[in-house]
């Protein structure tokens, strides 16, 4: 039977953590003490210094030779059972899997939600207050396994998913022909906004995939650069490294140029483009000034004489955009469009239209931002969807091609065939994923903290040596602050989110059920399977009912996979975790 004194001791150990979290929340939401920039600095300190030192402190002070192998086996078996069940579910025929639930995506999220709790920040103080110091040593063992094994496996799964998406988008028809892979040194992740790929023929004649840093990532690194003027007369064109906040200039293009449309009430600003000015839409060049076009006037005249424009009056249905142009819509500069003002009228026709589609469609290069180039006339046209399609870039176009292939294949069966065509050889995928995972791990301070702490504990408890007092006290001071700062950082995160429940109530309820009921149930079954009974079984179940871990949410947000679900579990789960774990503690104490 749980006494009131024992319940008070549990509350006295856990409530101060919630006080730190609420102080941080109030500092942002109620009192306005901290700005978003200051919150980012605090979170950076917690992630790089406080939490790694907290992990090192707990791991280095725990005796690895007294590890409870049954408890570790139960925790491992729980995760293996969940992975096996998810793997079996992902192998079901496509007709049994809802289209809105991609097996790999849901498997990663369900594994994170059901098996990876917040053991370091919440688990150690809570379990120590409930079951004594011995449970703290057990939690340290879980922390070591999470940091070294399970978070690495989770990162591997995220990178595997990112690699599949990247290859399917860039090589929809030739993925099976890839024989080698090269990853540039500055690429640390295969996530779509950070990496892009292209194919080249190796000296031995085989197809090689080259993964490089995406143009979006390069632009973000050079966003503060000063815009340069183009060498084109009378035309100021900002390079890709220019500020994103540059004010777009007006264009001479108006709705009056489209038959049957009236110009808007608000007049557009005058454009600085002259009647003879040429300008290129090539914005992904790595040079800061646009390259000169090889536009040929005589070739343009011949093109005008032979060109045929498809007659139509239904601009809405055919998604045509008229542009005042006196030149051919095709340029010899990497196949990009070059326009010149004049008396003729050209129409831009989408790629699925017949006849002149290949010579009339604007196809920006990979990485070009459509918002920057279309901002000056996006409102005037009134067809944002059409402009978005024209400005989407090669990456989106290739992704659309993959989706079209799936659609033509006929529903679920077509999706299965498309997935089969997009798969690269296993050796190529493995090398690609291991390269990026290794680069991520060697840049993560928690990896070093866990490995160094485990190494020191193995040496210290084997040869009975102690850490120098100066070093020990320095680490102790920072690690003591790390626990409170970690909760403070959680409060800052809660305050900066627009909603506590960001994924919808039904999804949140299902996720909470998986986190607080399904996970502990699997842990209880795994513990019983390895022969755990008594207090150790109670510790295992309560440990599995802790709130959601933060690292899975960080990965989910970075890889853009169900981030709202993990965000809700971190925020709302932290609020309801204390009463839920107390209920588990009381019920298990009565059994």
From Swiss-Prot:
Its main location: membrane. InterPro entries: Auxin_eff_plant, Auxin_Efflux_Carrier, Mem_transp_PIN-like. Residues 28-38, 94-107, 159-450, 496-511, 557-568 are cytoplasmic. One of its GO terms (molecular function) is protein homodimerization activity. Coiled coil: none annotated. Homodimer. This is Probable auxin efflux carrier component 3b. It comes from Oryza sativa subsp. japonica (Rice). The lineage of its organism: Eukaryota, Viridiplantae, Streptophyta, Embryophyta, Tracheophyta. The gene is PIN3B.
